[in-house]
């Protein structure tokens, strides 16, 4: 709320219009407007406005001091108001650790309190704990030994969801089986990891370096496991190590070598592992020179970000300038790398666990969609159905080389792109990925259980290779919430958009694929299909699928360009006018009247969020709950599947029946 550089050119307008930034506008306003005027504009209760003014006044009081002359009473008051060490350091103009050591020397440390679950009617003895500076003593003692802290995944958002919570919970359960006292730090009441019976102590507090270090110094555990909760705990690795906290598993230096785009790209060059041409961002002129030398499109990749935040595909100099500005803002402390974006390539992932630098167990999953769709939004298949044996062999070889070079001890994930006989590495995460629960369920082999045992130094025998010989197929499909996000363009890109996922098994890919799609809300098309298949290349690639739809008895409707192409290739279709043409028969009318059962709309470029006809069609399809396909490879596999199975032919079987 304070200690930031957010300002508003029209403050009263910002106060009068509720947005996710209005609380910052209120903080700015309490120093410029009276409370009654702010209340009139926001309708926020005056009690809250006075409390916000107290916080703003504290920031001003802090700014009148330096770290060396800061009064202890003022520092204690700031901590009781909720100021973090970082906020105080920004106000004083000094370092975060300087503030930390200053307050510790003054005896200003948080106390551990139990959350009262009994409404203060009786003393509550719970393992729900939190930190506060408004206390005089701890509610618990810290004499227990053999403790391990697991950092959770934090709040659910796009990119961090229940998959990482599954990893955290399974790590805790394995630690308990091994005889350790388990401590979980997490602050999301939606998670299973914050259930009272999962761990020995639950610290319901934020996942920041300050909080983790405070709890670590209170508890004095054997160490921290940060590799299960996704990107948020992973980002704390170097800070924890630099402060002297024991990070269990893969070393923080290795984590940094993988997360830092420049370091990882340099490592791949050193190992002789192929990767797309790349360059670290220095300035716009150099970026444009690189893009023009390798040819557009290019991919912009910030470091240490969640779910591909600010990752973009630029098609020209104008887009490059816009996206670089966004990426630099999101990833200020770390480098932004530009690389050649390889079109029409397959994306494949390696989820693995390593034991002291040696590959211990792995799973190779294939994306249905070509590269350019974020792995969290992609439809994933295990075992791979269309990946060459030589490609998987080379992926394993590269995985072993990277595991050795980074001395990985625990879970990791590598993303590859393959085109023809060429395999290139695009990313590596030295933590559990969101597909670990999926591969564990498909193989019926808990990768997190194995990873946790290896992290704790348990000597594990090799896994029997028969575990990986499957006579069924698993498919993981993404769940989107575009209906809840007004105006969002429901098209897939390199930045993640899905909010959930479903995995299904089948005796064949097509069966598992259809079951997964039905589970996330798709419906079998009954009669009418609209085709808008994008640029000429896409039209040509989709032609066999259009013929198959016709042969299956579907009525084909199409936009003018697609219809002309189909007619030239002897496929009849009825033309529907574009939304902006305002003539009947119009696509919007057909959608609104429920006359279309499926819409296949292939965008003309990777990223264009403008109010075009294509966008209007996609948005209207989502708003009227008409199944929508925006990816060419997905459309092809979907048509293959409905040609092979009717809905009545899909088997309903339990997971343990496979």
Q: Language model features by range: what are they?
A:
Residues 1-63, 68-74, 78-82, 96, ...:
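ATP-dependent carboxylate activation and anion-phosphoryl transfer catalytic cores
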Residues 37-38, 87-89:
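Short alpha-helical "recognition helix" segments of helix-turn-helix
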Residues 79, 85, 91, 130:
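Iron-sulfur-cluster electron-transfer modules
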Residues 101-106, 110-273, 282-289, 507-649, ...:
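ATP-binding N-terminal substructure of ATP-dependent carboxylate-amine bond-forming enzymes
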Residues 259-262, 305-309:
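Conserved A3 ("GATE") glycine/threonine-rich loop of ANL adenylate-forming enzymes
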Residues 290-298:
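Acidic/histidine-enriched active-site and ligand-binding environments that engage anionic O-linkages
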């Amino acid at each position: 709320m304070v200690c930031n550089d957010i300002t508003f050119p029209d403050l009263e307008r910002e106060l009068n219009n509720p947005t996710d930034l209005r609380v910052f506008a209120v903080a700015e306003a309490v120093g410029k407007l009276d409370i009654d005027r702010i209340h009139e504009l926001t309708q926020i209760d005056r009690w809250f406005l006075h409390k916000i003014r107290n916080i703003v006044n504290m920031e001003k009081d802090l700014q009148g001091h330096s770290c060396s002359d800061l009064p202890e009473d003022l520092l204690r008051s700031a901590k009781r108001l909720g100021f973090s060490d970082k906020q105080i350091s920004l106000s004083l103009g000094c370092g975060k650790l300087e503030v930390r050591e200053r307050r510790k020397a003054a005896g200003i440390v948080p106390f551990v309190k139990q959350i009262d679950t009994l409404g203060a009617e009786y003393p509550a003895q719970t393992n729900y704990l939190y930190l506060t500076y408004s206390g005089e003593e701890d509610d618990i003692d810290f004499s227990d030994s053999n403790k391990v802290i697991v950092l959770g995944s934090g709040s659910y958002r796009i990119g961090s969801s229940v998959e990482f919570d599954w990893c955290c919970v399974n790590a805790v359960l394995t630690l308990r089986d091994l005889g350790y006292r388990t401590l979980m730090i997490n602050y999301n009441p939606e998670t299973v990891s914050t259930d009272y019976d999962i761990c020995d102590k639950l610290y319901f507090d934020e996942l920041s370096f300050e909080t983790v270090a405070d709890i670590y110094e209170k508890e004095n555990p054997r160490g921290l496991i940060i590799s299960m909760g996704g990107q948020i705990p992973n980002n704390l690795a170097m800070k924890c190590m630099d402060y002297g906290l024991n990070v269990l598993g893969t070393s923080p230096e290795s984590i940094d070598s993988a997360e830092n785009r420049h370091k990882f790209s340099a490592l791949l060059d050193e190992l002789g592992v192929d990767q797309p041409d790349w360059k670290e961002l220095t300035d716009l002129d150099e970026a444009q020179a690189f893009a023009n030398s390798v040819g557009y499109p290019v991919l912009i990749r910030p470091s240490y970000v969640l779910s591909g935040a600010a990752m973009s595909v630029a098609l020209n100099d104008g887009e490059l300038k816009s996206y670089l500005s966004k990426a630099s803002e999101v990833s200020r402390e770390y480098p932004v790398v530009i690389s050649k974006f390889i079109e029409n390539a397959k994306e494949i992932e390696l989820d693995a666990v390593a034991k002291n630098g040696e590959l211990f167990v792995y799973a190779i999953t294939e994306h249905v969609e070509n590269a350019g769709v974020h792995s969290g939004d992609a439809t994933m298949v295990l075992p791979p159905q269309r990946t060459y044996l030589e490609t998987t062999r080379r992926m394993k070889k590269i995985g072993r080389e990277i595991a050795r070079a980074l001395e990985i001890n625990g879970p990791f994930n590598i993303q590859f792109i393959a085109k023809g006989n060429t395999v290139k590495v695009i990313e590596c995460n030295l933590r559990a990925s969101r597909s670990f629960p999926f591969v564990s369920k498909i193989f019926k082999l808990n990768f997190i259980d194995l990873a946790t045992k290896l992290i704790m130094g348990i000597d594990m025998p090799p896994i029997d290779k028969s575990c990986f010989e499957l006579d069924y197929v698993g498919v993981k499909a993404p769940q989107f919430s575009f209906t809840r996000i007004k105006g969002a363009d429901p098209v897939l890109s390199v930045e993640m958009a899905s909010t959930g996922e479903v995995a299904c098994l089948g005796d064949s890919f097509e069966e598992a694929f259809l079951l997964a799609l039905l589970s996330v809300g798709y419906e079998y098309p009954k009669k009418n299909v609209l085709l808008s298949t994008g640029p000429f290349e896409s039209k040509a690639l989709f032609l066999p699928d259009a013929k198959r739809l016709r042969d299956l008895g579907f009525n084909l409707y199409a936009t003018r360009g697609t219809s002309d192409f189909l007619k030239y290739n002897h496929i009849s279709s009825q033309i529907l006018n574009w939304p902006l043409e305002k003539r009947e028969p119009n696509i919007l009318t057909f959608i609104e009247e429920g006359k279309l059962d499926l819409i296949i709309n292939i965008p003309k470029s990777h990223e264009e969020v403008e109010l075009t006809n294509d966008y209007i069609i996609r948005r209207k399809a989502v708003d009227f709950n008409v199944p929508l396909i925006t990816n060419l490879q997905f459309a092809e596999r979907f048509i293959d599947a409905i040609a092979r199975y009717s809905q009545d032919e899909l088997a309903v079987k339990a997971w343990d029946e496979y």
